[in-house]
């Protein structure tokens, strides 16, 4: 970890200053053959019925993008079921959006809730990491943002001026320092309590914050962070969504969810 602590701030600063970006990113080979069987097929058909947007994905996405969004949509659907279907997603803000390739899943939830025209935004701290294809996260994200009629920005959520949203998501936030270092960020970005507080501050009254964590240890740490938030604000109510499963696609870790409702 010593080298990560030493070099990450340097490389992150270089990426942020250079802001590597080039035009031309697109999906090269769209079109997916759906080959699910058994329980996976049953669950996929269920998602298609609830979220009609999924049908278009098979024509417009490549396989990797398709599988990614099916996985995330399955998790989002489980969050919705936990709310009893009462929560209207409305405007949406995703914090820590990476390359925003799962924006389609967010938009599908909005469309299903008659919120197709609602705002959808993503923010990512490390947006200029360069992939092997020569394009940056920003390049990928802007392509997906254009196709989903959403907005994407590179910046620090703790400092950026952002509008509040009815639904705010944190998918796999860094609650421990080691994963953050392994992903190339500096320890200066390790401020989990501040990020949770900020996410809740950006959640509208009557809205919800949805959080997904990897593994029981991260989930326990996440719950402690949320409890501290609630101890300072009597308008917050935490609900454990439990383990988020996916019968369609595989994910290498157990995923646990939390819903925080803001009165």
Locations of regions flagged by a protein language model:
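A short glycine-rich, Lys/Arg-flanked "PGG" loop and its adjoining helix->strand segment in the class I
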Residues: 183-205
